[in-house]
Amino acid sequence: MAYHHLAMAAADMAAIHDFYETILGFELVKVEIGPVPDGGWAKHFFYRMAGDDSSFIAFWELHEVPGCDNLETSLSRAAGVPDQINHIAFNAPDLDNLNQRKDAWQRAGLNVLEVDHNWCHSIYTKDPNGNMVEFCVTTGTFSTEDRELALKALTSDQISHSAPPASIEIHRATVE
């Protein structure tokens, strides 16, 4: 089952809009505006991620909400963990699409980290909130042994580390 939407607070909605609509290609389709139960009010913006209305990413622009003056919008920084721990991963249908996105990100002035994880291939950059954003395509299959190892890892730390990524590349922005 897929999720309907992921919602997060935004510090700079104009920058978020530029990133998610102009660079990622998600379409702003809806805003809900109204009071927040604890006080203040908010705009809740919804961006369509797929060609239909089944999957969205949403952002809250908060106004006069108590306790939200110095809002930390990076999920990882708010949790006190490294940037790559809490991240947003979107599906890429194939490697061609992934490469097109990588090129578009670079042309938009973004640095891109590309990783071949041996079973999936990913590109990463950061959004204006400071969140790590990933596009990923599954390139491998899962075996019974993969599942057994995953189940064992739930209850044991006495297991071998995974193989290192097949490749890791940093692609610098190519703004013209």
Model-assigned labels for residue ranges:
Residues P35, A79, L113-E114:
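Short Gly/Pro-enriched turn/cap motifs at secondary-structure boundaries
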Residues S54, P66-G67, G140-F142:
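Short, acidic Gly/Pro/Ser/Thr-rich loop/turn segments
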Residues I16, Y20, I88, W105:
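Hydrophobic pocket/interface hotspot
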Residues F59, G67-N70:
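A broadly used, surface-exposed interaction patch
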Residues L62-E64, P93:
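Histidine- and/or cysteine-centered catalytic micro-motif in compact active-site loops
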Residues A9-L62:
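Core segments of cupin and vicinal oxygen chelate
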Residues A2-A11, R48-G51, D69-E176:
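Vicinal oxygen chelate
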